[in-house]
From Swiss-Prot:
Species this chain originates from: Oryza sativa subsp. indica (Rice)
Tissue expression notes: Highly expressed in flowers before pollination. Expressed in roots and shoots.
Statement: the UniProt record of this protein carries the keyword Nucleus: yes
Keywords, alphabetical: DNA-binding, Hydrolase, Isomerase, Magnesium, Metal-binding, Nucleus, Topoisomerase
Function: Required for meiotic recombination. Mediates DNA cleavage that forms the double-strand breaks (DSB) that initiate meiotic recombination.
GO molecular function, one term: metal ion binding
Enzyme Commission number(s) from the entry: 5.6.2.2
Chain sites annotated for binding Mg(2+): 219, 272
Induction: By auxin and benzylaminopurine.
Cellular component annotations (GO), alphabetically ordered: nuclear chromosome
Catalytic residues (UniProt): 126
The protein, known as: Meiotic recombination protein SPO11-2
Domain Topo IIA-type catalytic per the UniProt entry, residue ranges: 24-169
Chief localisation class: nucleus
Length: 385
């Protein structure tokens, strides 16, 4: 009953293979939580049902993942989850705590939404740690359980009242107009740029004005600040954006909004030449596996500008580094995925064959002003994949 009652609440268009998470108002999310509770209680009182009902969740395992491929060259491909399910059961030893965690998080979300508040994952962790220390001993427990709740209720994380913890920033040829009519001219800011709020509701209401021709996604904050300090956007009409490492939800959200507002503005990624850099690019391009139910909402058609294998001739041998065990682990995961395109796979294979990795900073061997020239040259020459 729980599976039918909650799962039937949302369908993803006409494609029944794809399962999605809806953007919902607080009242609707609270109603879905109430339905889940009622279904669970009904199962407990049904003589024909098992003594303890299991929670039906959409599986995030590899067998249930797929890639919705773009039909046209400039369209966006994205990761999706199909309808294969898994269960959290109180009767299985390995699942018992995870089963309880789902109810604890739903209880907390019900309270948060009733109070009209938003909390970060970190705030949620410390609250649950103080109230239920037996079940929540690390941040990972909260992160995984939130995705379980998203899977059960089929609503987005933001709809649960959980706000993204944004590290992101942007700068360049862009003016932001907020809901209170305030304007931010991102072309006159210091090299740290404009901090991206974690509140997706605020980001969804921003009005953009731009004469840029390109968007450049930068992996590292230090590289972002170098390009901003050089004011690359003064001679190359562009917007710079960074998540300062692995892309957080808010940075992906605003990048997607920019791509929707300016569909003819190409997006380029500047990442390290290592498996982690490619993984970051793929998250922007296809979405996150862990958030498969809502990944399609944030996927963008991102091109790989650099670093790439063709750029290694610009880097001195002394700047190469050995691949680390973590690099090999990421590479293995990427190679086994369904979405890695051929040219990306070739780059990853070259990394493994050479056993080397290189960071963008290695280009500083040509001087600090070389980076901006490198980026501009590659864009103008169409040197990206």
């Amino acid at each position: 009953m729980a599976e039918a009652g909650v799962a039937a609440a949302s369908l993803f268009g006409a494609d029944r293979r794809l399962c999605s998470a809806d953007i919902l108002p607080p009242a609707e999310v609270r109603a879905r939580i109430e339905v889940a509770v009622l279904n669970f209680l009904a199962a407990l009182t049904d003589p024909a049902a098992p003594a303890i009902s299991a929670l039906p969740l959409i599986s995030r395992g590899a067998a249930n993942r797929g890639l919705r491929r773009a039909l046209l060259r400039d369209d966006v491909s994205s990761v999706y989850l199909s309808y294969a399910s898994c269960k959290r059961s109180l009767t299985r030893a390995n699942d018992a705590k995870a089963f309880v965690r789902v109810w604890k998080v739903m209880e907390m979300c019900y309270k948060i939404l009733g109070e009209g508040k938003l909390v970060t994952l970190r705030e949620l962790f410390y609250t649950l740690l103080s109230e239920s220390p037996t079940y929540f001993t690390c941040q990972r427990h909260v992160n995984q359980t939130v995705q379980d709740v998203v899977s059960l209720l089929r609503c987005t994380r933001q709809s649960l009242g959980i706000m993204a913890s944004s590290r992101g920033a942007l700068i360049g040829r862009l003016v932001l107009q907020g809901p209170e009519e305030e304007h931010v001219d991102c072309s006159i800011l210091g090299p740290s740029g404009h901090a991206i709020t974690g509140d997706l509701n605020v980001l969804s209401k921003l009005i953009f004005s731009s004469d840029a021709r390109y968007i450049i996604v930068v992996e590292k904050d230090a590289i972002f600040q170098r390009l901003a300090e050089d004011r690359i956007y003064s001679h190359l009409p562009c917007i710079l954006i960074t998540a300062k490492g692995y892309p957080d939800l808010a940075t992906r959200f605003i990048l997607h909004r920019l791509s929707q507002t300016y569909p003819n503005m190409p997006i380029f990624a500047l990442v390290d030449w290592n498996p982690a850099g490619l993984a970051i690019l793929c998250t922007y391009k296809y979405g996150s596996i862990s958030m498969g139910l809502e990944s399609y909402r944030y996927a963008c058609n991102v091109k790989w500008l650099g670093l790439r294998g063709d750029d290694l001739q610009l880097i001195p041998q002394s700047a190469y580094q050995e691949l680390k065990p973590r690099d090999l682990q990421i590479a293995k995961s990427l190679l086994s995925s369904k979405f890695l395109q051929d040219k990306h796979r070739a780059e990853l294979t070259l990394m493994l064959e050479t056993g080397k990795r290189a960071e963008i900073e290695a280009l500083y061997s040509h001087g600090f002003d070389f980076l901006g020239k490198y980026v501009a040259r590659k864009i103008v020459q169409g040197d990206y994949i």
